[in-house]
Amino acid sequence: MQGHAGFFKALGVDLPLKTFAAPQQVDELILPELGFGWSDRYAGSPAYRRFMMSRLSAAAEPDGCDRLYISRARLPAARGGVLAEEAIEQNLARLGYEIFHPERHPVEVQIARYRAAKSVIALDGSALHLAAYVLPQGARVTMILRRSRANATDYIRQYKSFLGITPAVVDVIRHDWIAGDAGRADFRSVGELDLPRLFDTFKTMGLIPRDFSPDLPDAHQLRAMLQSLRDRRGEPFRILGSDATRAQDKAA
C-alpha cells in the first residue's frame, strides 16, 4: 500500500491504511458495491464517477501542453509496447506534442498534464484509464493498439461513460512479437506497427498536417531494435501466427 500513498493523497484519503499478511477476525465487515471493474463495470457507477472525477480533478491545476503523447518507451523491457516508439515520439515532438512518460512523475503531475490536454495520443495501457478521470470535456483521445487482442471496448466504455467522448482507435499492427510460453498477444508482447500507415492515418484524422514527412526507421533498423529488446529481456521473440517461422528466418 505504501507505493500507492500518492494516489490516496490525491483522492483526499488521509485515514490510516493497513494490510495484513495473515487472516484476521473482525467485529464488523463492510463490503461496498464494486463501483468500477472489468467488462461492463468499466462504465463506473454514478457514485464512483462523481467521487473519482471530483477528487482527482481537485488534486492539481491544469499544467502542460494542450497536445500530449503518452509514451511507454521508457518502461522496463519486460513490459509490453511497440517497436520504434521513439520514432513516434520524435515525429510528434517535431509537431509540437509534449512527450510524457507518466511513470516518471508523481500522480499530481500526471493529473495536471491530463487536465491541460485537449488532444491525447497514446498506446493502449493503464495511463489512459487515469486520464479518463480528469481530461477536460470535449478532449480528443486517439488510442493506438499495441497488441492485436487489446480490448478497446473497455476503454471506449469508460470514456463514453466518464466524459461523453469516444476515443478513436487506430489499428495498424503488422505483427505481434511474443516471448516465452505465450500463446497469444498479452501484456508482455511487443507490437510491430505499420508506421507509414500510422502517420497517414494521423493525417486523415486531422491530427497532423498532410504535408508532414515523418522520419521513420527502415526494416533493417526495426530488426536491430528487436534484437536490442531481445538482449535486454534475455529471451527470444517469435511472431504470433502461422507465418512465424518464415518471418523469424527473415529477421535473422
Report the location of each language-model feature:
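The feature primarily captures lumenal catalytic ectodomains
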Residues: M1-A252
